Amino acid sequence: MINLRKTHPLMKIINHSFIDLPAPSNISAWWNFGSLLGICLVIQILTGLFLAMHYTSDTLTAFSSVAHICRDVNYGWLIRNLHANGTSMFFMCLFLHVGRGIYYGSYLYKETWNIGVILLLTVMATAFVGYVLPWGQMSFWGATVITNLLSAIPYIGTTLAEWIWGGFAVDKATLTRFFAFHFILPFIIMALVIVHLLFLHETGSNNPSGINPDSDKIPFHPYYTIKDALGLMFLLLILLSLAFFSPDSLGDPDNFSPANPLNTPPHIKPEWYFLFAYAILRSIPNKLGGVLALLASILILLIIPFLHTANQRSMMFRPISQTLFWILTANLITLTWIGGQPVEQPFIIIGQLASILYFTLILILLPLAGLFENYMLEPQR
C-alpha cells in the first residue's frame, strides 16, 4: 500500500513541513519557541472566538459585557483569563524567539527574518487594539495616548488621528473599528506565519554552531515533535498557573474601573510587553522625536542582517559579542522597568541612558565587536 502522507496533495505538505522534514541534529531548546508561538496563536484565536460571541463593541455595554462573560457565561472567567494571560505568554515566547535569532545569527536568512519582524509588528498592533476592548480606564487612556502620537506627524498628523478615531476623540466609532481590527488581524498573522515557514523551509533551520548542518540531519518526527511537546507542557503549566491562581497579576488595577474621559489615571502605561518601547518613547522630550525613536526601536531589527560583520554566524564562539548581547538583554529589562515608573527623577535619566545604550549596542558596539573578533582570530605574524 502506498503511504498516504507521502502521496496525498495536502498530507504531502504537512509531511514535508512537520514529519519528514530534515532538521539539524544539534538544535537546542531555544528552537522550541517557534512551535510554542504557533500553539499560543491557536489558543488566542480559539479563546478570542468564544469571547467575541458574548462581547459587545459599544462604549455603553463593552465593560459590562466583559463582566457578564466572567460572571454568567459557562467557564467565561477561564476563557477570558486564558486569553488575557495568553498574550503575555505569546510575547514572552516572541521576545525569546527574536533573542535566539540575534544570538545565533538566524537573521542571515533575510526573507524569514523580515517576515518575522512584520509578524512582530502585526502581533503588537493586534495586542494594542485588543487591550482597548474591555473599555476600562487604562484601555481608554492607553488608546488615547498612543493614537494621539499620530498627531505628531507634520501636516497630516491631526487629520490622520481623527481618521483613526472616527471622530474628534476616542469614542464609540474607535471601539467598533478596533474590535473589527482585533478580529481580522490574527487571521492575517496566520497567513504570515505560513509565509514565514515557507521561507524557513527554503533554507532549512540554523543551529547553535552556525555552521552548515547538511551533513548531519535527522527527521523532525519523532525527535523534535517530542521535544516540542515537552516545551508545550511547560508553556501550558505556566499559562494555566497564571489563569487559575493569579489571573490579574499582569494587568493594571485601573482597568477594573469603567472608562471615564473626565478622569485621567495618575500613571498611564501599557501592558508589560510594550514598556521597553514606551520607555524609549518617553525618554525624548520632543513628541515627534519620541515617535520616531519608538518606531526605530522595533524597525532596527530590519537592519540587523546588514550590521553583521563577524566571519562566524553564531555568537557561540564569540565571547565579546556574547557579553554585549547579555548587556543588551539587561538593558531591555531595565527599559521595561523604567516604562512602568512615573516620569520623575531618577527614572527620567535612567530611561534616557538606557535608550541611548540600546541603539549604541545594536548600531555600533556589536558590529565593532564582530570586526575585533575577526582580527583576533586571524593568524598573527
UniProtKB/Swiss-Prot annotation:
Q: How does it sit in the membrane?
A: Multi-pass membrane protein
Q: Which residues cross the membrane?
A: 33-53, 77-98, 113-133, 178-198, 226-246, 288-308, 320-340, 347-367
Instruction: List keywords of the entry alphabetically.
Output: Electron transport, Heme, Iron, Membrane, Metal-binding, Mitochondrion, Mitochondrion inner membrane, Respiratory chain, Transmembrane, Transmembrane helix, Transport, Ubiquinone
Which Gene3D superfamilies does the entry mention?
Cytochrome Bc1 Complex, Chain C
Q: Recorded GO terms, molecular function?
A: metal ion binding; ubiquinol-cytochrome-c reductase activity
The entry's localization annotation reads: Mitochondrion inner membrane
Also noted in the record is: Heme 1 (or BL or b562) is low-potential and absorbs at about 562 nm, and heme 2 (or BH or b566) is high-potential and absorbs at about 566 nm.
Indicate the quaternary assembly. The cytochrome bc1 complex contains 11 subunits: 3 respiratory subunits (MT-CYB, CYC1 and UQCRFS1), 2 core proteins (UQCRC1 and UQCRC2) and 6 low-molecular weight proteins (UQCRH/QCR6, UQCRB/QCR7, UQCRQ/QCR8, UQCR10/QCR9, UQCR11/QCR10 and a cleavage product of UQCRFS1). This cytochrome bc1 complex then forms a dimer.
Task performed by this protein: Component of the ubiquinol-cytochrome c reductase complex (complex III or cytochrome b-c1 complex) that is part of the mitochondrial respiratory chain. The b-c1 complex mediates electron transfer from ubiquinol to cytochrome c. Contributes to the generation of a proton gradient across the mitochondrial membrane that is then used for ATP synthesis.
Name of this protein: Cytochrome b
**The species this protein was found in:** Sminthopsis dolichura
Upper taxonomic lineage: Eukaryota, Metazoa, Chordata, Craniata, Vertebrata
